[in-house]
Amino acid sequence: MNIDTVRANAFAMPLTSPAFPMGPYRFVKREFFVITYRTDPEALRSVVPEPLAVTQPLVHYEFIRMPDSTGFGDYTESGQVIPVEYEGVAGSYTHAMYLNDHPPIAGGRELWGFPKKLALPTLKVHTDTLVGTLDYGPIRVATGTMGYKHEEVDIVEQARHLSAPNFLLKIIPHVDCSPRICELVRYYLEDIRVYGAWSGPAALELAPHALAPVADLPVLEVVGARHFIADLTLGLGEVVYDYLAK
C-alpha cells in the first residue's frame, strides 16, 4: 500500500477494517432515564475543567438504551453529566460514561473525546418500576429506580434540554505518553424528535469502586427524574479551547 493510499484511507484503526464507520450517527427510539441529584460542590469543582464553570451543585446520572444506532448497533450506556456554563451559555459536561459495546467506545473516544469505559449497564422495566443498573466486572456500582410513567412531562421542554450544547475533554497521548491532543470539544444533538416523556418518584444508589468512581460525586439528595424516548443525530464536534496552544 503506497503512502497516498494510506493518507486517503486513514480514518480510524485498523486501517483496513476500522472499528467504527463514518457518520452521520443516527439514533432511533433512544431511551433515557436521567436522575438529577445534589452533590458536594467542592467535589464537582475538582473534576470540571476550566474554562467551564460549575453553576449549581447538581449531577445528572444517566441510563440510556440505544436499540438502533447507525454503525454502533444495539447497546446501553450509563454515567454522569454535569450542568455547566461556557462563556455564559448553559450546557452539560460529560464526566464519565460506561457502556457495553466496543464501536461506540472507540468512536466516542477518538472522534469527540467521550470519556467511555467498558462495563455492563442495563435499563429495563420491572413490573411497575423503571430500573437502571451499572456493573463494573462483578461489582454493582449504580442502581437507579423510578416509578414507571407516573406523570407526563412536556416533550417540547425535553427537546429544548437535548438541544443545549454539550462539552467533552478530549485527550489523546503521543507515542511517548506526553499529551498530543488536549482539547475542550463542544457538540450538539441534532434532528431531535421526542416521542414521550415522563417523571415519577426516584432513588439512586452509588457504590465506591476504584476504577468506576461514580460515588466520588456522592448523592446528597435526589431532586428529580425523567424518562423519555427520542430520535436524534449525534452531531460532530468543534474545538472551543486548546489546552496545548501556546
From Swiss-Prot:
SUPFAM superfamilies: Acetoacetate decarboxylase-like. Pfam families: ADC. The active site is at K116 (schiff-base intermediate with acetoacetate). It catalyses: acetoacetate + H(+) = acetone + CO2. The keyword Cell wall biogenesis/degradation does not apply. Gene3D superfamilies: Acetoacetate decarboxylase-like (2.40.400.10). InterPro entries: Acetoacetate_decarboxylase, Acetoacetate_decarboxylase_bac, ADC_dom_sf. Its EC number is 4.1.1.4. Keywords: Decarboxylase, Lyase, Schiff base. One of its GO terms (molecular function) is acetoacetate decarboxylase activity. Catalyzes the conversion of acetoacetate to acetone and carbon dioxide. Belongs to the ADC family. This is Acetoacetate decarboxylase. It comes from Bordetella avium (strain 197N). The lineage of its organism: Bacteria, Pseudomonadati, Pseudomonadota, Betaproteobacteria, Burkholderiales. The gene is adc.
